[in-house]
UniProtKB/Swiss-Prot annotation:
The keyword Protease applies. It is found in: Cytoplasm. This is ATP-dependent protease subunit HslV. The lineage of its organism: Bacteria, Pseudomonadati, Pseudomonadota, Alphaproteobacteria, Rhodobacterales. Allosterically activated by HslU binding. The gene is hslV. It catalyses: ATP-dependent cleavage of peptide bonds with broad specificity.
């Protein structure tokens, strides 16, 4: 999220972990404005079911912008059922080329339980390496912790929960109130 356009707004850590045929997406619940926590129980991870194909989306950035993107993604998935990569690429193209969408301040992590994609307003659709992806203010902390925890015998959900707890201990814009969704 751009500090230039939304000075003082901070928040969100979203993490996706794939292991042993399962994908877990976890997001914290904190929304901050400047030095003030405005809400500690926001739900930034959503389960969608367009055309009978389950998808989990986590978002960081402006909530209104993220919901606009979620609606667009759902339409793309309905137009291309079961084709997550195609839907994400089509969304990224629209996001990059449309004058209105271009100004939206959000990032998404999207999974169907097999593939994980990070979708950005710069037109990027990235598949993570090492079966872990993270976005948001505490994203780098969660990513580093999860990558280290992937060396253990922990399952995907335990890796995600522990990595998010580590991120919440380090990032002042991340809390330990998690929303966790599992596919697979």
């Amino acid at each position: 999220m751009s500090e230039d356009k939304f000075p003082g707004w901070h928040g969100t850590t979203i993490l996706a972990v794939r292991r042993a045929g399962r994908v877990v997406v976890a997001g914290d619940g904190q929304v901050s404005v400047g030095q003030t926590v405005m809400k500690g129980t926001a739900r930034k991870v959503r389960r969608l079911n367009p055309g009978g194909h389950e998808v989990v989306v986590g978002f960081a950035g402006s909530t209104a912008d993220a919901f606009t993107l979620l609606e667009r993604l759902e339409k793309k998935l309905e137009a291309a059922p079961g084709q997550l990569a195609r839907a994400c690429v089509d969304l990224a193209k629209d996001w990059r080329m449309d004058k209105y969408l271009r100004n939206l301040e959000a990032m998404l992590i999207v999974t169907d339980g097999r593939d994980i994609f990070v979708v950005t307003g710069a037109g990027d659709v990235l598949e993570p390496e090492h079966d872990v992806a993270a976005i948001g203010s505490g994203g780098n902390f969660a990513l580093a912790a999860a990558r280290g925890l992937m060396e253990s015998d922990l399952d995907a959900e335990a890796v995600a929960r522990k990595a998010m707890a580590i991120a919440a201990d380090i990032c002042v814009y991340t809390n330990g109130n998690l929303t966790v969704e599992v596919l697979g």
